């Protein structure tokens, strides 16, 4: 799919993708629900609309993505209009992260404003994540262009240009061979990632009521 990101290639590989990617990803979701959402009584939608689609919504052009991602979201919102604790499957890696972007409208505006206004707190939270292997990135639009700068070393100040961002990402990835070696223990790594990302998640979500 990465070499031929088009609907015809998707049709050829649909059964394989379902058996080896989509269905295991759903079981991964189920494990997160049982081991994280339910025990902590988190108010998340975990069934409807939590997964991305392989085929692009590109007005009939027939394009497709070469990765899948999922994120739970709070009732009353949608996956794209909430702060996203995301889980992503790529051909060569798996990623955990946190994203907030302009699709979230007022929530994004409040989260960005709090980050800029309370920069000392934001830096402390971000630097802890960076030291744990996460990278910070942002872009002037909701999708991040390839090659856009990422920050993987502790910051002395918030990066220039952050105030004009339309999307902010904080992500940690592991390579494909490590994903395969982990097997079912990938869920344990996911639970650790949720714990690591939770302070920043609360910092952004609580900006609505700050």
Q: What would you call each of these model-derived segments?
A:
Residues 47-84:
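Amphipathic, interaction-prone secondary-structure segments
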Residues 75-114, 165-169, 173-176, 184:
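Intrinsically disordered, low-complexity regulatory segments enriched in Ser/Thr/Pro
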Residues 44-47, 63-65, 80, 89, ...:
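A generic structural signal for short, non-catalytic loop/turn and secondary-structure boundary residues
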Residues 42, 89-154:
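Compact, glycine/acidic-enriched structural inserts
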Residues 58-68, 102, 117, 151-163:
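Short, charged low-complexity intrinsically disordered segments located at boundaries
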Residues 32-56:
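Short secondary-structure junction/hinge motifs that connect adjacent elements
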Residues 1-41, 140-210:
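Long, solvent-exposed, polar/charged low-complexity segments
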